Amino acid sequence: MELNFTLNGALRTVITPAGENAQRVLFNQCRMHSVRNSDDGFGFAGSDAILFNGKVINASLLIAAQLEGAQVRTAESLGSWNQLSLVQQAMVDVGVVQSGYNDPAAALIVTDLLDRHPEPSRDQIDDALSGLFHRDGGYQQFYQAIELASSRLKDPDYLCQIAPEFRDDLRHIGKSCPKVDAAKMVQAKPCYVEDRVSEDALVIKMLRSPHPHAVITRLDVSRAEAMPGVVHVITHLNCPDVYYTPGGQSAPEPSPLDRRMFGRKLRHVGDRVAAVVAESEAIALAALKLIEVEYQVLPAVMNIGEAMAPNAPLVHDEPIVYMAGAPADLEQQNACSVRRGDEHMIINFPIGSRPHENLAASVHGQIGDVAKGFAEADEIVERTYESTQAQQCPTEPHICFTYMDGDRLVIHASTQVPWHVRRQVARIVGMKQHQVHVIKERVGGGFGSKQDILLEEVCAWATKVTGRPVTFRYTREEEFISNTSRHVAKVKVKVGAKKDGTITAIDMDFRANTGPYGNHSLTVPSNGPALSLPLYPCENVRFTVNTYYSNICPTGAYQGYGAPKGNFALTMAIAELAEKLGIDQLEMVEHNRVHEGDILKVLGAIGEGKMPTSVPHAASCALELILKQGRELIAWDSPKPADGDWRIGRGVAIIMQKSGIPDIDQANCMVKLESDGTFIVHSGGADIGTGLDTVVAKLTAEVLHCPLGDVHVISGDTDHALFDKGAYASSGTCFSGNAAKKAAENLKEKILFHGAAMLGEPVADVELAFPGLVRGKLGEVSLAKLAHKAETGTGFGILVGTASYITSELAFPYGANFAEVAVNVRTGEIRLDKFYALLDCGTPINPELALGQIYGATMRAIGHSLTEEICYDGKGIPLTRDLKSYGAPKIGDIPRDFRAFLVPSDDKVGPYGAKSISEIGVNGAAPAIATAIHDACGVWLRKWHFTPEQILRELGKLEQQASA
């Protein structure tokens, strides 16, 4: 079918199959990279927004035939190749652009809005952006960007302070500046994996299990293999016989190596049955229908209680092999195992695992005398709190593209962990690490989900077998049933306190549901107590962590990494105890909270796959100022008058996070001086939209006294950078950042040495000076001149600084969330009127990006608290398979008064006093909202997310108690 239409002012003619989707035509044939597919045509995400005959519409909702004769405008029409449009510049300046995946579409929508309404109201903004799913940024900064763009329409030279500034003694650190990669993302320049896929690439489509628990008894792929255009079919019969964990963690991984690329036993709906590798997506999908499979359906276990039950069906019944530290009864454990060929599970070292009891991992410990502490208490509360299954929902689905370059395998990946991908894939497909080149492209959102290896190994194996380029991309349905998600948890907390509110003992029993595989099954749940108990230092503390296998869809890493569930349970228990004692919740928090300098004794008993080498302390903590400021902002002590059926309540939660994993992880960096006096940084860090490349560039420029524009960062490329553990555990700033700072300092020493020689002065008399000078007492020399000298035949060789960063110290960001809700006692409706997130991340390296991280993380946490959940039917079949039914929030769902604040402290671990920022924001919304709900209407909601039905049910119980 021939189509003729006008695209960005030019006539276009394309030939496309009848019934083709307009988004695919614009992206694949017209190479409009701004028209991206995020939700498979559901029309929810808005990343495919175009102007169609002057109106904003999602291209995926159009069939190609509707393009005939149409006027189509995409984000490529904004600005020019090397010049941002007014709206794009405002978005970049304010810090809206993080992962960037749907920001070109956002820029087009906002441009259309300002064309129609040069000074739009909030309602007009909300209406215009109502079709955009902006998972990473949290929406709030769009108002600021639109206000800035509107002001510049009237005055092109209009300037305003984008964000507060910090550290007057520094040039770059603590000052706002655009992300170094923001322009290319908002302009839709090719930078994501899908932009790299070659036209001759084969396509993988996966046949997945329809059952939560089953064994394949017959598998016939012969008809699929015989289909024209099918190149290969991968099954458990011809895949590598290698066991691994999908979890992207440092080796040896603290997770069971409990999966094979394909296995006979299927452990969740969506588990892999067979992969068709074909010349096109259409052929691959057709071939899937030709595969014949017979299953022996097994009883499923879907929750912790079922998994713990005596004689429960076993999710993993295969033999167990230990690499070290095998338990004395291993032979007895294996005696009852089921042998299917050579299937087995590998455990690297003891993690408290008993798979044949559905126990994936466990850990326990205590400090002090818990029994004595409870005996000293005047009041004790013991409660159980639960969380549901939440999904990360990155706007860019998982995607991979692989090809052979000679005898080397090249992997373009949307990943948080390029070096872990290289190590894992090389082992799985039988290659050496130097034969595998992983290129982390820009990542359209991760939030933990792209820490795991979920499709890279299949794509790599297909390329190795066929010798052809191959691409594999998840559908949004696959994101829900085959991607990882947040662990479901059930946490029992017992807290005792004296009459004055002093906590005397805490006992936390943390039980987690890891689903079908054990990736992160030790480390995520152990962070539940590890990132909540230290907020309330107590002499007598006990914790127990047990993680169980089940047949729900997979779980894994998600921002907060266990902290949200532990913090919810502990905050709620302390709030309930405060009520029993007749003490205000905020006063109870103030009375027991951590203070700067406190020894965090409980962390001496909790490791993350390895016991700590020392007991950490709160080296920097701005909670005193945070709580004072939050109390004033939310008017904590002011009256809360009812409004008809609406009742007003306020709540608070304090939060903490780590900044990397001491004694386990490592980062490396190299900084090279170029012959014109500029610098290239080879950073192993993985920027997944957090602005890490900008942080690395700013740290380098600060040390070397040069303009930020003189620093270029190459990162996340295993051929062209140095090893780094990747983007997880809030490690970017402290680990990758410190490595960059140390490498720059190493180079600085060499520059000063050779600069002093060129000036004929002692090294002690010279220093670096802005912009790019070595200055002595008698004269100065430019870095360009020095670098040119280095490369001449009589020079001293190119100047390169390198550094490795490891540490045994912890840097803890702290914060508090304050919420004000209105609850309708007739309908149960919850309205989040105010939400204030105040965070201490040390010295903010880039303030506007830090604020964006807070808004995005907080909004995800609000979604988890009020609307988001993966649901199952009574047979264990997941019902949630798209963003809309999942309940992901949009701009109309944000609090009407939503503010974020940076409260600085000076930490000694991070570079220039910086601490992490990206994860901590998800840790506090649930308890802040839940305690506010209680303050409003008197009910305690102990399972999140919170629903009107829960409130009405609990209000009914209160009425029954009152009338009894």
Which residues fall in each region the model found?
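Intrinsic disorder at enzyme termini
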Residues: A10, A106, L129-V193, G630, ...
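Thiamine diphosphate
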Residues: R423, H437, R442-G467, T471-R473, ...
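Flexible, low-hydrophobicity surface segments
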Residues: S150-G341
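Signature of N-terminal electron-transfer/Fe-S-associated modules in redox systems
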Residues: M1-E165, Q392
